[in-house]
């Protein structure tokens, strides 16, 4: 039997995450979120298959507006996957979403992140921190607002899992440091409704080590 570390429970809508709760099934839509009818149809199909939480991509303002209507037509908690702009998160919160997924690689302005956190805290909406290798900040530039590192500043040349010499800064270190930077912004505002911290890399060994 696996021994699990005790965690603080977080509620996404009415679904309990952590704190000894059962594992829940979450999925993500592959429709264009702006197409409310198609997105709701797919969510209903996932509900029938046993899905308990659903995440939708929010790449622009039209998608953010659609989330409010989608929320009205489904029966499971709705998570907004925010792309690039903090105002999309604010609009989704106003529309009643149950959780946000923020990527610290593409939402890097500290004041903007703080504004999102304040709004989420007012509504008791949890946040998932999702670190993606494809949009990590530049090496030495965590918290800065310029540049995407897959094309600059040595991120691609960082040693991967199992390749780093002792004491050498690796892609694992960079992914963890990126998450810790955003966690610090949440914690400085006494925001403790962190649903999960997730990491995505191209290789399984690096994902496992992170």
Predicted segments, located by residue:
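Short, glycine/acidic-enriched loop or turn micro-motifs at the edges of active sites
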Residues: 25, 84, 206
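Alpha/beta enzyme core
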Residues: 12, 17-23, 33-56, 61, ...
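Conserved small/polar residues in nucleotide/adenosyl-binding loops
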Residues: 200-206
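Active-site flanking residues adjacent to catalytic metal/cofactor-binding acidic residues
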Residues: 80
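N-terminal basic/disordered segments at the start of proteins
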Residues: 2-15
